[in-house]
Amino acid sequence: MSKAKEGDYGSIKKVSGPVVVADNMGGSAMYELVRVGTGELIGEIIRLEGDTATIQVYEETSGLTVGDGVLRTKQPLSVDLGPGILGNIFDGIQRPLKAIADVSGDVFIPRGVNVPSLDQTKQWEFRPSAFKVGDRVTGGDIIGIVPENSLLDHKVMLLPQAKGTVTYIAAPGNYTINEKIIEVEFQGAKYEYSMKQSWPVRSPRPVVEKLLADTPLLTGQRVLDSLFPGVRGGTCAIPGAFGCGKTVISQALSKYSNSDGIVYVGCGERGNEMAEVLMDFPQLTMTMPDGREESIMKRTTLVANTSNMPVAAREASIYTGITLSEYFRDMGYNFAMMADSTSRWAEALREISGRLAEMPADSGYPAYLGARLASFYERSGRVACIGSPEREGSVTIVGAVSPPGGDFSDPVTSATLGIVQVFWGLDKKLAQRKHFPSVNWLISYSKYLNALEPFYEKFDSDFVTLRQVAREVLQKEDELNEIVQLVGKDALAESDKIILETARFLKEDYLQQNSFTKYDKYCPFYKSVGMMRNIVTFHRLATQAIERTAAGNVDGQKITFNIIKAKLGDLLYKVSSQKFEDPSDGEGVVTAHLNELNEELKEKFRALEDEYR
C-alpha cells in the first residue's frame, strides 16, 4: 500500500456481512479489484452509484470499521496463467493453498494473505518455436513450449491482444515465469512478455469460431457412454439429492474420461470431499498408450472453495475454474471442468443479492440467476483457437446440482436444464437400492445422439440399433412392472418374461457398476458395446425361439421362458458375468471373449430350436 496515492483510497461507509459500501470511489470501474481495510482484504466492486461503490469481499469481514480505507487497484479480478497450474490446488480467487500453508503454518487461510498464484522462483525449461527476430506475430501464436510434466507440454502463447514484429526471443534454456522471453515492436513502441499472463476471470477468452462437437466424452461409466453420451465441448448436468453419488460420478470423470486435463472446482461442498480428492488423486494412476503409469494429479488442477470458506468467493471460484480451462483449450487441448456444485454457487448469488436488497424471484434467488448460469455454461464448446499454428481445443462443463430434497423443480435445476444438452438425473430410490451409478434411465437424456452418429457408425455400425433396442426394453419393463405388482410374473406372456429377464441383465449387470473393483471401475467403450451386443442378442434369439415354436408347433411342444432358463442356465450366467472381463488384459483378449459368447448364444439357441421343432 506504500506506493498508493491518496486519490486511490475510498473509505468504508457500511458493512453488511460480505458486502461493504465505500465512499469517495469516483473513477472506479465495475468488477475492479480493491483491498479493503487495514488487513487489505480482497474485494470486487459489484455496483456503482455516483461515487459510492458496493464491494463484495472474498474474506471474513469481521473487524472492519466505518472509515477504514479502501484501496483501488485499477485492475479487474484476474488469474495468473502460466506454467505451474497443473497439479496445483487453489482457493476460489487463485491463491495457492499449499504455498499459503507453508508461509503461515496455519490450518486456515489467514486474512489478507498475499501470495503469488504461481511459483515465481522455479526455473522452467523453455524451448522457443520457429519464430525469429523480424517475424510478425499476433495474439495466440505459440512462441515456445515448456515441458510442464511428463503428461502435458505447456504451450506458451502470446497474449490475445498482443501483436507486432519480434525484436527479441529468448534462447532455449531455463527461465522463471517473470523473465522476458519475447519482445515485440508495434507502431514504434516495444512490449515485453514473459511466460505468465493475466486474464480477467469474467471475460471469455477470444476464439476464431465455435465448431460442431462430434467426439464423445468417454467417461468409463457404461450407463453414460452408451445411453446418454456427452461430447467433448458439451455441457452436462448431474442433479441429484444427497447421497446419490454426484461427487463419485464427478470424480470418476476426472479420473477416467478421455480429456487431456481436468479442472475440478469444489464449490461450496463439504471440506472432507475436497480432502478425499486430495488424498485419492495423487495415488491414482492412468496407463499411457506406451504402457507407463502416470499420476492423475499431473493433468488435474483443483479449485477448492469449501462450504466453510467465505460465501462471496464461491461465485469467483466458478469463473476462476472456467478461465483456467479456457487457457488450456487455447493451447489446443481438450479440457473438462467439473463444478461441484452449482447450487452452492447459486446460493452465494442469492445471499449477495439479499444483502444488496435486490428484488427476489423464485425461492429468493435473484431474477438474473438464469442469465448468470447461461453465461457460465456458454463458455464451453469446441473451438478453432486464435493464433498459429492452427489448432482446435475444447472445454466440457459438467455441473453437479444439489436440489434441496432431490426436487428437480427447484429454480437452479430448472434453469440449468434449459441450458445444458445432457441431463444425467440421479435417483434417490436407486441409490437406496445400492444401484450405482444411480442414473435414472427413464428421465435422463442426451441431445447429442444425432451429432455422434457418424462416430458410432465408424466405431461399430450396429451400436445405434443396439442402444435403441436396450432403451425400448427398459421402457417396456417399466410398463410391465405395474402389471407384475398386480397379478404376478406367472400371468405374463412368455415374450414379456423375456423382456423382464433382459431388463434384469441390463440393470444389474450393465448399468450398475462397481467403482471400487479393478475390473469395473472403468469400462472402455469397446467392452460396453460388446456387452450390450450380447444382452441384445440374447433378447432377440429368446424372443424369436418362443415366437417360432408358438406359431408352428401343433404338438404343444413350445419353448417357454422356464425351458430356456433350465436348458441354458449356464449361458445366462455367462451373459451376466461379462462385466468381470478385466480391461487390463488388453482389448484383443476382452473382445475375443465377448465375441465367443455371442457365437455360443447363437449356437445354443439354434440347437434348442432344433430340439423343439
UniProtKB/Swiss-Prot annotation:
Pfam families noted in UniProt: ATP-synt_ab (PF00006), ATP-synt_ab_N (PF02874), ATP-synt_ab_Xtn (PF16886), ATP-synt_VA_C (PF22919)
Catalytic activity field: ATP + H2O + 4 H(+)(in) = ADP + phosphate + 5 H(+)(out)
SUPFAM superfamilies from the UniProt entry: C-terminal domain of alpha and beta subunits of F1 ATP synthase, N-terminal domain of alpha and beta subunits of F1 ATP synthase, P-loop containing nucleoside triphosphate hydrolases
Binding positions for ATP per the UniProt entry: 240-247
A GO molecular-function descriptor: ATP hydrolysis activity
GO cellular component entries: plant-type vacuole; proton-transporting V-type ATPase, V1 domain
InterPro entries (UniProt xref): ATP-synt_VA_C, ATP-synth_a_Xtn, ATP_synth_asu-like_sf, ATPase_a/bsu_AS, ATPase_F1/V1/A1_a/bsu_N, ATPase_F1/V1/A1_a/bsu_N_sf, ATPase_F1/V1/A1_a/bsu_nucl-bd, ATPase_F1/V1_b/a_C
Coiled-coil segments: none
Keywords (A to Z) from UniProt: ATP-binding, Hydrogen ion transport, Ion transport, Nucleotide-binding, Translocase, Transport
EC number: 7.1.2.2
Keyword Nucleotide-binding part of the UniProt annotation: yes
Origin: domain of life: Eukaryota
Keyword hit for Transport: yes
GO biological process: ATP metabolic process
Family membership: Belongs to the ATPase alpha/beta chains family.
Subunit structure: V-ATPase is a heteromultimeric enzyme composed of a peripheral catalytic V1 complex (main components: subunits A, B, C, D, E, and F) attached to an integral membrane V0 proton pore complex (main component: the proteolipid protein).
Record's function text: Catalytic subunit of the peripheral V1 complex of vacuolar ATPase. V-ATPase vacuolar ATPase is responsible for acidifying a variety of intracellular compartments in eukaryotic cells.
Protein's recorded name: V-type proton ATPase catalytic subunit A isoform 1
